[in-house]
C-alpha cells in the first residue's frame, strides 16, 4: 500500500467550510489567497444562493459551476506552462493553485450533499465503543494514539472481511498466498526507496516535547496571519507564495521560514525546535549486537518482490501470475487521528500481479466489462468535472483506463467492496494526477469512499511497472526476470568482458569479487567504449561500491561472438491492488449504520450476511426451561453447519433482545417460542434484521437456510417466497408446564 497513502484532512477542511458563512464561501480567494502572478487565474465568485442546506441538482450545479470553471482554467494553465517548458517554480505554483481550487470545489460538493446522506458519526461511534467493536489500545494506561484493539464483534467482522477477500481474490484468481516477516533489514527498504522518501519534516515543542508535522503547522500559522485584517497586501502576497511551494521546501528552508514568521507551538505558545526529517517507519536493530538496522515493514509488498524467483519457479516459470499477502504494516505517523482512518499499525491485503509488459491483456476482463461505476480521471479533475459513471469496457476502449489488466482489477475491487457493505453510490475510482504519483508508480487509481470525513482512499490500484524488481536486481546482482519463449529462434551478436580471474585476484585480493560482479553486468555500449580506452591507453578505470579500480590489458579482454536465442528475458510489470482493511471496515461502519424509523434510540448495522460478525442469534422467548432443549439442539446444529451464532437467553423482552443483536449487526434471529414446544413438527421463527420480517420453518431446516443466506446462495426474498410469514403465536404459556 500500498501502499495506500491517506487523503489528508479532507474531512476537516470540509467541516471547516461548512461552518463558514455563505459570503466567505462565495469568495474562495479569501480562504486561499493565492495570487500567483503568471501561475493563477482571475478570482471566482459564487451566486448568493450558496448555503449550508442541501439543494436540488440544478441549484447545486449553479453554485458549483463557477468553481468548476476556475479549476478548468487553472488546469489549462498548468498544461500550457508544461508545454512551454516554463520554469519549474512557476509550474509548482500553478499546480499548488490547482490543488487549492480542487479542494474548494470538493468541499462545496460535500457541503451541498443531502442531509440524510450524512451519518450521525457521534451516535455511530458511541455504538461502536459501547458494544466494543474496537477501542483505543492500552486504555487503562491512558491509551496510545493511532493504536487500537478490536473487541469480539470487531474482530469477528474483520476476520469475515478478510475471509471474504481470500475467497473473492485468492481462490477466484488462483493467487499464490505467502506470509513474510514483518521485520525488514534496512538495505531492502533503502533499495525500495522507503528509507529516503518515506519521511516528513517534524518540529518539537522545546519544553514538553510535543511533536508537529512542520508543513502542516507552518500552513496553519500562515493562514492565521493572513486572516488578520492588519496584514498588508504585500505580506499576504509573500505568504501566498510560500504556501504555493510548501511541498517543495527542504529542511533548511523550512527552518528559515519558521524563524521568519515566528512560528510557535499552537498548544502552549512555546518555542519550537528546528525541523528534522522524520522517517515514518519504525526503526529497530536485529540481533543483540545492534549492528543490523531494520524496520517494521511499511507495506507487505516488498516480501513478495524479494520472493519473486521462488514464486515464478512455483508457477512453472510462466507469466502472468499473482501473489498476495495479508498482514500488519506499520507507519509511525506524527499525528494520527480520525479513528481507524489514520493509524500507526494496520492490516493490509496486497496483490502483486506480474505480467509481461508487452501483453497487458487480461483473459477474464469481459467478466467485468459491463460493470458501471464512477470513474474520476486525472483529466476530469483538472477540468473541474465530477466523477462520471461509465461502463468499464468503454473506459478501457476510450483510454481512460490504460489496459485490461488494470481494468479487470478495478472491476474486481468494485465487486468486493460492494459485497462487504460499501454503498456503490458512495464509491468512486480516482486516478492519481502526475504530481501525486508515488515514487514507484506509473499509473494509479484509488478506490475512494464518501464518509463523514469526506472522500477517503481505501484501496490503491497501481501500475508499478518494473520499478521494484529492477531496483532489487541492481542492488543484489540477482536477475529478477522471467523467460519468454520466442516464436522463432534468433541469432544475436554478443559483446562481453573476459576478465582474468588470476590477475584481478592478485591485484585486488578481497575486492576482486566486486570487480568481477561489476564487469558481468556491463552493457555493449560501455564495453565498446572501455575497449577503445584499453587499446589507446592500455588501461581503464571502473568505480563500484564507492571504490575505484584500474584494469590493464593483462587483466581483461573483450570477447565477441554470436549466440542463438530460444527465449528472451523480460522484467515483469506489476499491477498492485493494495487494500487498507481498517479503512474498509470504517467505511462499512458508516455505510451500514442506521436508526430505526420512529425510534431514535434503536440503532443497527446492516452488515451483509457474508461479513456479519454473527450470522444469526438464537433467542428463547423467555427463560422458561421448556425452551432450553430446543436452544441447545439448534445451537449444535448451527455449529455443525459452520454458522457463527450468538445465544441470548438473558432476561428482558424479546424486542429488547432483538434490538441488542441488531445493534451489533447480527443478520438473522431464530426465536424459540411456545409454538416450538407445543406443536409438531417443531418449528421456530427466523427474523431478518433489516426488514424485521419473520418466517416460520422447521427447526431441522433452519441451519441450512441460515447457512445459504450467509453464503449468498439465496436471498431473504427467496426465503419469504418459500416459507409462510410469521404473524403471531398460535399457542401460549398456559398450554405448557408452569415455570
From Swiss-Prot:
Phosphoserine modification, residue list: 35, 700
Effect of residue 658 to F: Decrease in catalytic activity by more than 10-fold
Gene Ontology BP annotations: diadenosine tetraphosphate biosynthetic process; mitochondrial glycyl-tRNA aminoacylation; tRNA aminoacylation for protein translation
Sequence positions that bind glycine: 299, 350, 576-578
GO cellular component terms listed in the entry, alphabetical order: axon; cytoplasm; cytosol; extracellular exosome; mitochondrial matrix; mitochondrion; secretory granule
Additional remarks: Human GlyRS uses direct ATP condensation to synthesize Ap4A, a unique amino acid-independent mechanism, in contrast to the classical amino acid-dependent mechanism for synthesis of Ap4A by a tRNA synthetase, that involves the generation of an enzyme-bound aminoacyl-AMP which is then attacked by ATP to form Ap4A.
Database matches in PANTHER family: GLYCINE--TRNA LIGASE, GLYCYL-TRNA SYNTHETASE/DNA POLYMERASE SUBUNIT GAMMA-2
Protein name: Glycine--tRNA ligase
Source organism of the structure: Homo sapiens
Amino acid at each position: 500500500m500500498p501502499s495506500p497513502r491517506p487523503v489528508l484532512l479532507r474531512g476537516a477542511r470540509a467541516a471547516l467550510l461548512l461552518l463558514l458563512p455563505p459570503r466567505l464561501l462565495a469568495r474562495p480567494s479569501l480562504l486561499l489567497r493565492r495570487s500567483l502572478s503568471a501561475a493563477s487565474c482571475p478570482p471566482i465568485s459564487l451566486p448568493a444562493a450558496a448555503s449550508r442546506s442541501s439543494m436540488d441538482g440544478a441549484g447545486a450545479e449553479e453554485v458549483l459551476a463557477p468553481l468548476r470553471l476556475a479549476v478548468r482554467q487553472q488546469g489549462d494553465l498548468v498544461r500550457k506552462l508544461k508545454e512551454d517548458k516554463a520554469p519549474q517554480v512557476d509550474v509548482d505554483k500553478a499546480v499548488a493553485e490547482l490543488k487549492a481550487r480542487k479542494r474548494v470545489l470538493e468541499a462545496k460538493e460535500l457541503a451541498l450533499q443531502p442531509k440524510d446522506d450524512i451519518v450521525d458519526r457521534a451516535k455511530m461511534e458511541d455504538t461502536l465503543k459501547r458494544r466494543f467493536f474496537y477501542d483505543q489500545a492500552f486504555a487503562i494506561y491512558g491509551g496510545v494514539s493511532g493504536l487500537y484493539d478490536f473487541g469480539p464483534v470487531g474482530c469477528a467482522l474483520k476476520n469475515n472481511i478478510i475471509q471474504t477477500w481470500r475467497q473473492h481474490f485468492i481462490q477466484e484468481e488462483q493467487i499464490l498466498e505467502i506470509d513474510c516477516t514483518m521485520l525488514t533489514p534496512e538495505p531492502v527498504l533503502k533499495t525500495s526507496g522507503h528509507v529516503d522518501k518515506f519521511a516528513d519534516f517534524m518540529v518539537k515543542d522545546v519544553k514538553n516535547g510535543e511533536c508537529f508535522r512542520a508543513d502542516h503547522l507552518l500552513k496553519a500559522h500562515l493562514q492565521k496571519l493572513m486572516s488578520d485584517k492588519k496584514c498588508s497586501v504585500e505580506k499576504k502576497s509573500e505568504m501566498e507564495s510560500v504556501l504555493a511551494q510548501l511541498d517543495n521546501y527542504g529542511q533548511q528552508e523550512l527552518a528559515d521560514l519558521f524563524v521568519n514568521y515566528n512560528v510557535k507551538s499552537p498548544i502552549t505558545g512555546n518555542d519550537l525546535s528546528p525541523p528534522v526529517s522524520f522517517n515514518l517507519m519504525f526503526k529497530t536493530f536485529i540481533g543483540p549486537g545492534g549492528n543490523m538496522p531494520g524496520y517494521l515493514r511499511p507495506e507487505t509488498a516488498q516480501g513478495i518482490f524479494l520472493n519473486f524467483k521462488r514464486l515464478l519457479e512455483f508457477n512453472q516459470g510462466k507469466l502472468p501470475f499473482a501473489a498476495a499477502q495479508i498482514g500488519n504494516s506499520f507507519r509511525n505517523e506524527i499525528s494520527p487521528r480520525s479513528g481507524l482512518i489514520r493509524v500507526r499499525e494496520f492490516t493490509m491485503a496486497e496483490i502483486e500481479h506480474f505480467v509481461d509488459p508487452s501483453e497487458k491483456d487480461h483473459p477474464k476482463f469481459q467478466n467485468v466489462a459491463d460493470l458501471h461505476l464512477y470513474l474520476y480521471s486525472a483529466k476530469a479533475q483538472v477540468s473541474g468535472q465530477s466523477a462520471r459513471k461509465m461502463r468499464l469496457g468503454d473506459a478501457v476502449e476510450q483510454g481512460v483506463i490504460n489496459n485490461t489488466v488494470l481494468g479487470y482489477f478495478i472491476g474486481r475491487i468494485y465487486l468486493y467492496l460492494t459485497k462487504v457493505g460499501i454503498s456503490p453510490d458512495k464509491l468512486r475510482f480516482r486516478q492519481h494526477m502526475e504530481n501525486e504519483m508515488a515514487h514507484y508508480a506509473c499509473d494509479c487509481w484509488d478506490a475512494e469512499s464518501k464518509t463523514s470525513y469526506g472522500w477517503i482512499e481505501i484501496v490503491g490500484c497501481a501500475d508499478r511497472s518494473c520499478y521494484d524488481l529492477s531496483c532489487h536486481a541492481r542492488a543484489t546482482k540477482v536477475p529478477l526476470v522471467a523467460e519468454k519463449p520466442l516464436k522463432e529462434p534468433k541469432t544475436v551478436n554478443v559483446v562481453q568482458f573476459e576478465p582474468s580471474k588470476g590477475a584481478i585476484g592478485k591485484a585486488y585480493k578481497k575486492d576482486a569479487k566486486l570487480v568481477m560482479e561489476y564487469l558481468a553486468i556491463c552493457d555493449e555500449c560501455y564495453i565498446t567504449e572501455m575497449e577503445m580506452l584499453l587499446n589507446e591507453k592500455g588501461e581503464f578505470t571502473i568505480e563500484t561500491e564507492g571504490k575505484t579500480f584500474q584494469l590493464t590489458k593483462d587483466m581483461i579482454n573483450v570477447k565477441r561472438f554470436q549466440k542463438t536465442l530460444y527465449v528472451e528475458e523480460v522484467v515483469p510489470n506489476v499491477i498492485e491492488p493494495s487494500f487498507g482493511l481498517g479503512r474498509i471496515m470504517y467505511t462499512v461502519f458508516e455505510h451500514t449504520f442506521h436508526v430505526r424509523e420512529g425510534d431514535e434510540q434503536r440503532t443497527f448495522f446492516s452488515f451483509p450476511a457474508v461479513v456479519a460478525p454473527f450470522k444469526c442469534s438464537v433467542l428463547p422467548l423467555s427463560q422458561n426451561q421448556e425452551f432450553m432443549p430446543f436452544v441447545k439442539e439448534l445451537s449444535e446444529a448451527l455449529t455443525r453447519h459452520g454458522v457463527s451464532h450468538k445465544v441470548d437467553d438473558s432476561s428482558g423482552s424479546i424486542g429488547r433482545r432483538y434490538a441488542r443483536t441488531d445493534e451489533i449487526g447480527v443478520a438473522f434471529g431464530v426465536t424459540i417460542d411456545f409454538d416450538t414446544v407445543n406443536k409438531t413438527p417443531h418449528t421456530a421463527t427466523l427474523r431478518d434484521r433489516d426488514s424485521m420480517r419473520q418466517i416460520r420453518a422447521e427447526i431441522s431446516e433452519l441451519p441450512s437456510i441460515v447457512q445459504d443466506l450467509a453464503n449468498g446462495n439465496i436471498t431473504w426474498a427467496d426465503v419469504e417466497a418459500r416459507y409462510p410469514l410469521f404473524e403471531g403465536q398460535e399457542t401460549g404459556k398456559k398450554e405448557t408446564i408452569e415455570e
